[in-house]
Amino acid sequence: MVPLLKMTNIVKCFGTVKALDGVNIQLQQGEILSLCGENGSGKSTLMKVLCGIYPHGDFEGEIVFDGQVVEVKTIAETEALGIAIIHQELTLVKELSVLENLFLGAEIETFGVLDFDRMHAEAVKLLKKVKLDVPPDTRVGDLGVGQQQLIEIAKALSKNARLLVLDEPTAPLTESETDILLELVNDLREEGVSCIYISHKLNEVKAISDQICVIRDGQHIGTRDAKSMTTDDIITMMVGREMKQLFPREEHDIGDIVLEVKNISAWSKANSHIRKVDDVSFVLRKGEILGVSGLVGAGRTELMECLFGCYQGRYSGEVYLQGQKLTLQSCHDALDAGIAMVPEDRKRHGIIPIMSVGENITLASLTAFTQSGVLNDVKEASAISESIKALTVKTPNADLAIKHLSGGNQQKAILARFLLVNPTVLILDEPTRGIDVGAKYEIYKLMFQLVKQGISVIMVSSELPEVLGISDRVLVMHEGKIKGDLINDNLSQEQIMDCALSEKVTA
């Protein structure tokens, strides 16, 4: 059988650096191929080659699609072949309707006039195909991320896509939205649509794939039948070594209470009658990792924003750090007191993309390198160099714009920023979201190094295995309330979910 897609000996260089070094992949019609690898392994570069972002002539190797050698130079040419890529960062126009987004740039006309009746009828068919029950005139900005993801797929199908490339499609989705998306991908496979699926969530990769291809350091490590591979097999191929334990727990001492939170309530920014956090109280001890678990919408991020002084709505309650009552009206108040927070969305709230790695690292501690209003460049450069070395931030140099780093290295740079302020309490909101398994492991090890130094860590995570693998104690939140405060003594995922959905409060 002739493969639908065959990419042979693909080489792509940036200067003297080989981002891709002789990569080969192929897939059949109606097949799902998952592409796995650490951040910076070359997955995205390979897909940019396939989709015309890096045009023919800008790389070496051959691409054959449906039996024909193709030499595309634009994304439009790729789409005309039937290849569509859906990026992690969605490209929809939020102010336009669903219908307008579906046909943007490909409007249906009759005698030179836009035919809205035909577009409406086609939109209804496309939305039905992706199992999205919304009116075509709905404003896209009013829909959830999961629904917007389905609109992107519908848009690709409107162009008769035969091959979908999905780049981290479930990273921002809830569990139920993820189930809907995976079911749709399976349905499309049955209809003969092929898919290249890129994800760090190896349980999804195992569940949905026919074949799994692993790339490491720009090289093709291997492609194997998904049914024959375990998660450990995938990880070993990705990182080049066997990882005996994904969560590297280390013994550490837990001391006296360092943070005390009393009766925190926070009201919705959009509706002042709705409580997002409802009368929450808890304590945190020195050298403790406190996991905060709960379903999406439980109020976890809002609670952390209150503790960091950056919640945009109205909130009340008391926070005591080492016995002293704090006034937290801004991030500056929190940082001055000794509370630092690595935010949930690093791209929107964590990094300044056009600034250098070094500038991002020292952003919160510039006063430490300033004397009489003048910045001491030598002192700052020394601190940057030490931070990059201590957190193993992989960057050619500190002057590179941080947007060019992988997600894991961006996250480590943000961590470096807040460690420079010498915090007593470090809040990590979804610290490993969207980063690969190797970078996750490094961040877990760093967390244990920090608590050994006496720093107390609050970790918010939607990944229950992560919460159970790292935390000393777990707070379980549901609908703004704490439903459980549990010592992590062989806790199970079922116990946490039962606690979240139970009417009782568990301690």
UniProtKB/Swiss-Prot annotation:
InterPro entries xrefs: AAA+_ATPase (IPR003593), ABC_carbohydrate_import_ATPase (IPR050107), ABC_transporter-like_ATP-bd (IPR003439), ABC_transporter-like_CS (IPR017871), ABC_transptr_XylG (IPR013455), P-loop_NTPase (IPR027417)
Compartments, as annotated in UniProt: Cell inner membrane
Keywords from the named record: ATP-binding, Cell inner membrane, Cell membrane, Membrane, Nucleotide-binding, Repeat, Sugar transport, Translocase, Transport
One Gene Ontology cellular component annotation held by this UniProt entry: plasma membrane
UniProt main location, coarse: membrane
Catalytic activities: D-xylose(out) + ATP + H2O = D-xylose(in) + ADP + phosphate + H(+)
Membrane topology reported for the UniProt record: Peripheral membrane protein
EC number: 7.5.2.10
Residues that hold ATP according to the record: G37, E38, N39, G40, S41, G42, K43, S44
Enzyme class: translocase
Annotated signal sequence range: none
Pfam name, any one: ABC_tran
Domain ABC transporter: start-end pairs: 5-242, 259-504
GO molecular function: ABC-type D-xylose transporter activity; ATP binding; ATP hydrolysis activity
Task of the protein: Part of the ABC transporter complex XylFGH involved in xylose import. Responsible for energy coupling to the transport system.
NCBIfam families: PRK13549.1, xylG
Annotated family: Belongs to the ABC transporter superfamily. Xylose importer (TC 3.A.1.2.4) family.
Subunit structure: The complex is composed of two ATP-binding proteins (XylG), two transmembrane proteins (XylH) and a solute-binding protein (XylF).
Name of the molecule in the record: Xylose import ATP-binding protein XylG
Organism: Photobacterium profundum (strain SS9)
Lineage: Bacteria, Pseudomonadati, Pseudomonadota, Gammaproteobacteria, Vibrionales
